[in-house]
C-alpha cells in the first residue's frame, strides 16, 4: 500500500510539472535537478512521466525559438534584408514540429543563423535605414511583437533550462529520453544563456531604432525587455 501511494505521488508530481510548462506562467518552471534525483531513487515507475515533462520543455524551447525567428524574419524583411529574412525562415524549418526531432547539429545551425541575422540587423540599424527604399513600418512592428513574444516565452524557460544543465546526461537517459534528444537537451542547457543575451540585445536595438523612426512599438516588446537580463 505504501508503495502504491508513493508511486501515485510521483505520477501526480510529474503531471503537475507538465501542466506547469503548458500553462506558460512566469513562475511555472521545471526543476530538473530534483527530477533527476527523484529518478535515481524512484526507479522505472517515473520514467514515462519524466520523459513527458522533459519533452514538454524541449517543445516549449522550440516554440519560443520559432517565434523569435519569425520576428527576426519580419524585421529583416522590413529593412530590405531579403537574404537575412530567408536565412531566419530556413533556420525555423530546422526545428521541425517539436522536441522529438531536435539534434545538436540542427540546434547549432539554428543558433548560428540567429546570430547572423542579428548581426545583419544591427548593421542596418547602425546605418539608420533600410537596404532598399523606406522601412516597412508595419512589418517592423509585427517583427517586434513576434520577437518580444518569443523572448518572453524563452525567459520563462530559464529556470527549467538551468535545472536541465545541472542534470547528469545519464539521468536524462534513465528518464526515458532517447539518446538524440538527451544530447540536444544538454546542448540547449549550455547554449541557452548566451543565446538569450544575444537576442535580448537585438530586441533592445530594434526597439531603439523603431522609436527613432516613429514606428509603433508593441507593448509585448517593451515588456519582454523588462524580463530579460
Placement of each model-derived feature along the sequence:
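Solvent-exposed, non-transmembrane amphipathic alpha-helical segments
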Residues: 24, 81, 88, 92-95, ...
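Bacterial N-terminal signal peptides that target proteins for export
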Residues: 2-14
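Long, low-complexity, polar and repeat-rich extracellular regions
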Residues: 61, 228-229
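N-terminal Sec/ER secretory leader and immediately downstream segment
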Residues: 28-119
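Extended amphipathic alpha-helical interaction segments
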Residues: 107-227
